[in-house]
């Protein structure tokens, strides 16, 4: 039978005791957290939380030894390199503390770019020499200004989603470019029989109020669309029904006391249109008569002259 390492057994026992005595226990991902940063996190929060970096297998043994079915669900949230936080703080306070550990950092190489990483035109603090070649190797256009290496043109070093190569990570560190956000990442938190996710704990009163307002508006829209009568939409539904009924009555030429004025207005408009059309026709006829009248006048004058001459010879 394989013997259990006494040191590991001690770690499991201490961890189980810490979890049992604490109001809350949280599992955090520590991937990317540098040693110095972890030391600073511990120093700043020494009076608030106890942070223990452990292997998953030891954590699982500690959870199993407590015999709390709900607590063991923390296993489902455990992945990657982890640390266990035990505290008497409320869940929201622990979440805020964890979020406060996030800091900007330059990559070391091998990380995934969270967004396009660009280098702006600048005058660096490096004198001309071998460093200029290093800049050019990663695709930067360089020159010399004021006795220093200058980046002449903006360039995208790494595109979003790409793995950051070590040579480009080195250049970012030299230029103090910090595209990464490094710190503790909350994976799961257990307190008073409830298992919390980071998404739940990230909700603020303002966010909750905003989401409630959005949900309320969507519920009203669904209620209207499905003709589900509730007090909140009843007035709107009645108003919409009246508008549709009025439009139907007009289309069917069904005259009521409410739409009489509208029918009169329609009749008036139609009368004006008809009158305009008739006036156009009369104007055309009069113009054609005016064109013919001179010919008739000329003809009557000739006839008068003929009649006058005829009377002289009678």
Swiss-Prot record:
It comes from Thermoplasma volcanium (strain ATCC 51530 / DSM 4299 / JCM 9571 / NBRC 15438 / GSS1). Part of the 50S ribosomal subunit. Forms part of the ribosomal stalk which helps the ribosome interact with GTP-bound translation factors. Forms a heptameric L10(L12)2(L12)2(L12)2 complex, where L10 forms an elongated spine to which the L12 dimers bind in a sequential fashion. Forms part of the ribosomal stalk, playing a central role in the interaction of the ribosome with GTP-bound translation factors. Belongs to the universal ribosomal protein uL10 family. PANTHER family: 60S ACIDIC RIBOSOMAL PROTEIN P0, LARGE RIBOSOMAL SUBUNIT PROTEIN UL10. InterPro entries: Ribosomal_protein_uL10, Ribosomal_uL10, Ribosomal_uL10-like_insert, Ribosomal_uL10-like_insert_sf, Ribosomal_uL10-like_sf, Ribosomal_uL10_arc. One of its GO terms (molecular function) is structural constituent of ribosome. This is Large ribosomal subunit protein uL10. NCBIfam families: PRK04019.2-3. Transmembrane segments: none annotated. Residues 283-302 have a biased composition (Basic and acidic residues). The keyword RNA-binding applies. It comes from the Archaea. The keyword RNA-binding applies. Keywords: Ribonucleoprotein, Ribosomal protein, RNA-binding, rRNA-binding. One of its GO terms (cellular component) is cytosolic large ribosomal subunit. The lineage of its organism: Archaea, Methanobacteriati, Thermoplasmatota, Thermoplasmata, Thermoplasmatales. Gene3D superfamilies: 3.30.70.1730, 3.90.105.20, 6.10.140.760. Residues 282-314 are annotated as: Disordered. GO terms for biological process: cytoplasmic translation; ribosomal large subunit assembly.
């Amino acid at each position: 039978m394989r013997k259990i390492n006494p040191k590991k057994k001690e770690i499991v026992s201490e961890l189980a005791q810490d979890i049992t005595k604490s109001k809350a226990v949280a599992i955090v991902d520590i991937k990317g957290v540098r040693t110095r940063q972890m030391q600073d996190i511990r120093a700043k929060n020494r009076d608030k939380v106890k942070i223990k970096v452990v292997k998953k297998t030891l954590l699982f043994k500690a959870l199993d030894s407590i015999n709390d079915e709900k607590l063991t669900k923390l296993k489902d949230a455990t992945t990657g390199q982890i640390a266990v936080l035990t505290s008497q703080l409320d869940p929201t306070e622990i979440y805020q503390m964890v979020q406060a550990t996030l800091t900007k950092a330059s990559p070391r190489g091998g990380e995934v770019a969270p967004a396009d990483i660009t280098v702006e035109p600048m005058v660096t603090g490096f004198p001309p020499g071998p460093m200029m070649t290093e800049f050019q190797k990663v695709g930067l256009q360089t020159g010399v200004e004021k006795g220093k290496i200058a980046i002449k043109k903006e360039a995208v070093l790494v595109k979003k989603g790409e793995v950051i190569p070590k040579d480009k990570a080195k250049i970012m560190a030299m230029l103090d470019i910090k595209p990464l956000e490094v710190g503790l990442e909350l994976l799961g938190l257990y307190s008073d029989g409830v298992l919390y996710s980071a998404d739940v704990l990230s909700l603020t009163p303002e966010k909750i109020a905003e989401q409630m307002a959005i949900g309320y508006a969507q519920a009203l829209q669904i209620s209207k669309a499905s003709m589900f009568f509730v007090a909140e939409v009843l007035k709107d539904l009645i108003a919409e029904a009246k508008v549709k009924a009025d439009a139907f009555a007009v289309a069917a030429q069904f005259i009521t006391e409410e739409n009489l004025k509208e029918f009169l207005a329609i009749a008036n408009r139609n009368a004006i249109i008809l009158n305009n059309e008739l006036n156009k026709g009369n104007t055309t006829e009069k113009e054609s008569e005016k064109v013919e009248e001179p010919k008739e006048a000329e003809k009557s004058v000739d006839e008068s002259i003929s009649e006058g001459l005829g009377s002289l010879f009678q």
